[in-house]
Structures are given as C-alpha cells and as structure tokens.
Amino acid sequence: VMEGKNIVLTKQNEKASEIITAVQQENISVKGVVTDTKGEPIIGANVVEKGTTNGCITNIDGEFTLNTPTNATLVISFIGCQPVTIALNGQQTLNVQMQEEALSLETVVVTAMGIKKKAASLTYSTQQVGGDELTRAKDPNMINALAGKTAGVSITRNSSGLGGSAKVSIRGIRSANADGNNQPLYVIDGVPMLNNTSEQAFSAMGGNNDTGNRDSGDGISNLNPDDIESMSILKGASAAALYGSQAANGVILITTKKGKAGMQRITFSSNLTVDHAISLPEFQNRYGASGETSWGAENASMKAYDNVGDYFSNGVTATNSLSVTAGKEKMQTYFSYANTTAKGIVDVNKLQKHNITFRETASLFNDRLTLDANVNLMTQKIKNRPTSGGYYMNPLVGLYTFPRGEDLSVYRDNNGFEKYDENRSMPLQNWYTDISGFSQNPYWLTNRVTSNDKRFRTLASLSANLKINDWFSVQARGNVDYINDNYEQKMYAGTTADVAHQNGRYIKMNRQDFMVYGDFMAMFNKTWNDWSLNAAIGSSINTTKVNSLSLDSGKSG
C-alpha cells in the first residue's frame, strides 16, 4: 500500500480469509419425501436447516426441495410425530419415515382442599364440568345446568318457580327421612359456603301442612354463572377429609375466574330463555259438572274452554353479564357485573337479581408469596313466589277442579276474581262455589295473596400462600359469608278462613345468617426419581350464627 512516498506492508487477516471461504461454500439442492409408518405421505411437515430460519414444508405428496450447505443438518417435524434429525454430509436425496409420538395428557383437578393434583393420584372419584357448560343455557339457579352432565348426580328442580332451590344428591339419597338433608357441601375456591334451603311449611306461621311449603331458594343460586371457571364433583369419604361431617353427602367444588397475566379483555354476554308449561293434565270435555266428586250428564255440544292453558303464559329470563380481565406479571384483576330479569309462567311471579364480583391476585418476593382477595355482592328480589305443594294456597287445585264447559275468564277479567260485598263494604273473593281451603279462585290467589322476597348477600375471602422452598409451603385462608333475608306476605280479606282471618293476614320475617371460616395448612410435595410424596396437614375453624324474627297477625285475629 502506497502512503505518500512510503510503502507499507501489512499481514493478511487469516480469519477474514476463512470467513470469505465459508461464505463462498457451495450450496446443494436437497430433495426428499416424508412418509408415515404406513408409507402414506405427510402433508405440511416442517423441514428446517438446524440453527437457521431456512426451511420449507412438504407438499400434497409429502415432497420437499431445500437449498442448503452440503454439511448442514436438517430437522423434520410434524404434529403427533417424533422429530427426525438428519446430517446431510453431501446427501441430496432423502427418504424420511416419521414415527407417531404417543402423547399422554395428564388431567389436573382441584381437590377438596383447593390443591391442584393429577387425577390419577387421587384416591376418590371426581368429575369436572367446565364453565362453558354452565352458561350455555343460563338458569336463575346455575346448579340446574349440571343436570345430565355428570354420572351419579341427581338434580331435581323445586316447583316453587323463579329463584327456587334445587335438590342435589350425589350417589343416591342417604337420609331415610323424605325431608332429610341430602345436599352436598358447596366449596368456593377451597372455602365452604352457606347453602341453607329455607323451605318450610306454612304451619310455622299458624297454618298446617296442607298449606304447602315456602321455598326461599338456596345459596348456590346466588352465584353468577359467568364467574365460574369450572365445577368438580368430589365423591368418597376422603374427598371431604378437611370439612368433616358437613361434607358427608359429597362436595361440589367451584373454581371461580381470576385475572391473567398479560391479558386485557372485556367480555359481554347476553342470554334469553323462554319457558312454557308443557306437562299439563288431559281433561275430558264430554260430561258437565254435577257435584264436587262426580260428573254430570253427557253433553256432546259442550264447549271446551282452555281454562288451564289460559292461566299459564310464557316465562322469559334475560341475563346480561359484563366482565373485565386485566393483569401484569405480578398482579391480576378480575371484575364482573351481571343482572338477571325474569318472569315466570305465572305472570305475577317476577325476579330481579344483581351480582358484582371483584377479585385481585398478586405474587410477591420472587413468587414465593401469593395473595388472593375476592368479594362477591348479590341482591335479589322475587315477587309472588308460588307455593310448593299443599292445596289451601295452591291455585292449581281450583284451576283443575273448575267445572268443564264453563268459562273461567269470567272470574279473571276486569278483576272478576273479587266482588264488592255490601255488608262488609269491601271487595271479597268471587268464586263459583263456597270459599274453602279445598277450593279458591286461582286468580284470587295470584293477585290477592301476594309475597315479596328480598335477599342481600356478601361473600368475602382472603388467602395467602407462602412457598418456603421447592417442596414445602404453608397456606392460610379466611372467609366471611353474610345473608340477610326479608319475607313479606299479604292475604287479603276474603281468603279462606283455613289460613287467614276474615280481615286478612299479614306475615313478615327476617333472617340473618353469618358464617366465619378459617383454615391453615402445611403442604409437603417431594419427588425422588419415579417416586413422589404429597402430604398436607391443617386445621380449620367454622363459626355460624343465625338471627331470626317473625311477625304474624295469625288467622284468628
């Protein structure tokens, strides 16, 4: 190199020469066919030069062509097959046969203690239902959505209309008493919840068993189905080890949704269902009325009125739900609001329910400490909940025994269910026969024997899990469950004397349930080669308090 009048000599860079030589290395065109163990071509297999992005996929005949250096290594992969690695060493034609890869997907379930375990390691039977199954056809009581989806679980709807309870039994009835409690224990995120079914005979309010029962619903119906991630049915004595005798009928474990790291999502869903009375008795239309227990003469020209069909209408349930999910690596948030508006198959039966849920999860100290806080608020109002069973207060008795060939609309339209009484200067019940416990106007019972149910519920829980090391951790959980029920019933003057005074009857009830639950657990999880040991020891405390107040004017004044 000439620099002015000087000649400068420099040593050649050997590394640069090597790089140039490598870059200038000759490429070859590699062709091949990829097949399975039966010789069938595999379409869409990935063929990639190892360590680079240079690659292609096989065509419909399993063939591929790829330009690559002579000493390259190819990796062939396809879903469901074991990857194949081939060092070319100058080869330009390949025949590749791929072996199927047997994948064993282990099912993970949540145990009664809220701990995730492999299903195969459990010593009791369990079944799991996803949240999507529960929200496909939304019911005011979400537990009804389990019907027919799990083996050995029987679910019976109560006949008390909107907001009524459901009777659930796992592996058969355990109580010989028809009124015995066969209900399972409901556990939300590892914490038991109140599920009192306030179904009681009107005898508690001065009547007798013939007046039927008042069903004020159950606790599980208060939850928002859209908040449920999954539901597991746990069977066997060991499934309920933590909760003692209260879980003797089995456990239904509910896992709720929570925020997820790196996800921001707003979800809105709306659902509308229509109910209709389809299982009605068949009525004869050949004989007229005679006495209360016999038919009259045959009348071929008797007009057939659809008095029973006219009494019922289409029930409509509308549910709207909005949820917001947001989260970062260390903290996640979940919020939801839902409202349910429903009208029963009897027009005066109506329901209004609101749910608010807020959940916050956090991981601290390099994920050694996990915190989880959850608050659920619910308000519910139900008007004119139908009576379950009996005949004094059951409108179906008067509806079904009304004379064939007569038009019941006379006792319905324009307040035809009541008639002004000159002697008492007030409207009283209007009916084709004497008013008695056995026979009352069904439209009087739906319009002049009214009721209102109101419920407010709060569920709040907090849990902390501290990971001491890779195989030992401790957990503490606490929960508060508060329910405030108010019930009011009015029986107007003119209602049968079997249940009401001649001037009517007024009933008001208040009940407050308060439960505090706490538990502490130490968990050991250690693996040695093919052996593993899982152990947990803990203790729980549960305190329940009930306050109730009843006011009743009675049937004797």
Label each region the model flagged.
Residues F202-G206, F283-S290, L351-K353, S388-V397, ...:
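Flexible, surface-exposed loop regions and adjacent strand-edge segments
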